[in-house]
């Protein structure tokens, strides 16, 4: 990332397996607790892959501080079309360097955040499970302020004629 306050997306792809209607889910929720140094930037969506159809309406999206939840609606969970698909959950975020301390090395410094999300599904028969995504690292390297090829010139002022002279 080129700027320590840049916006970017966290995306999570997950497969929902084919299920017989007797084993449909009673609940299915993707949850991401954003790490310190990252703030929600006001956009979350869900796409079905590979078609990239927007299926955001199949989920109730809520935020509470740094926690973003995608809860599948009961209407979606009761449809055969929900199962046997791959979904991509998208969360637009922004780096917030005021929440983390950079790591300094030589003439540069680096902001780094690590994140992972979970998916928890429960079948109508009560069996439930939670899976975690791999951890992803996002970073931004910046360089310490340098003044290159600077020179100092001395100026004097003659108060009577109001002119600055080198």
Where do the PLM segments sit?
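Serine/threonine-rich, low-complexity linker/repeat segments that form flexible spacers/stalks
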Residues: 1-22, 114-116, 125, 130-166
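...the same signal can extend to comparable exposed beta-sheet modules
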Residues: 53, 65, 69, 85-90, ...
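Serine/threonine-enriched low-complexity regions used as flexible
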Residues: 12, 24-26, 32, 76-139
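Sec-exported extracytoplasmic/periplasmic mature domains
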Residues: 17-18, 35, 96
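A surface/secretory-pathway sequence property marking extracellular, secreted
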Residues: 25-72
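Generic recognition of long tandem-repeat/solenoid scaffolds
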Residues: 9-11, 66-77, 166
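Extended non-catalytic domains of envelope/secretory-pathway proteins
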Residues: 7, 28, 33, 77, ...
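Surface-exposed loops/turns
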Residues: 4-5, 36, 83
């Amino acid at each position: 990332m080129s700027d320590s306050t840049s916006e970017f997306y966290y995306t999570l792809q997950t497969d929902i397996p084919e299920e017989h209607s007797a084993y449909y889910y009673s609940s299915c929720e993707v949850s991401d607790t954003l790490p310190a140094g990252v703030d929600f930037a006001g956009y979350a969506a869900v796409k079905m892959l590979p078609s990239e159809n927007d299926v955001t309406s199949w989920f109730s999206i809520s935020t509470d501080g740094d926690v973003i939840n995608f809860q599948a609606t009961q209407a979606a969970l009761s449809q055969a079309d929900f199962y046997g698909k791959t979904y991509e959950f998208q969360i637009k975020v922004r780096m917030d360097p005021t929440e983390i301390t950079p790591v300094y090395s030589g003439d540069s410094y680096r902001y780094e955040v690590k994140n992972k999300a979970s998916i928890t599904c429960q079948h109508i028969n009560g069996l439930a499970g939670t899976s975690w995504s791999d951890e992803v690292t996002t970073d931004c390297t910046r360089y310490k302020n340098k003044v290159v090829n600077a020179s100092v010139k001395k100026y004097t002022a003659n108060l009577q004629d109001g002119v600055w002279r080198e």
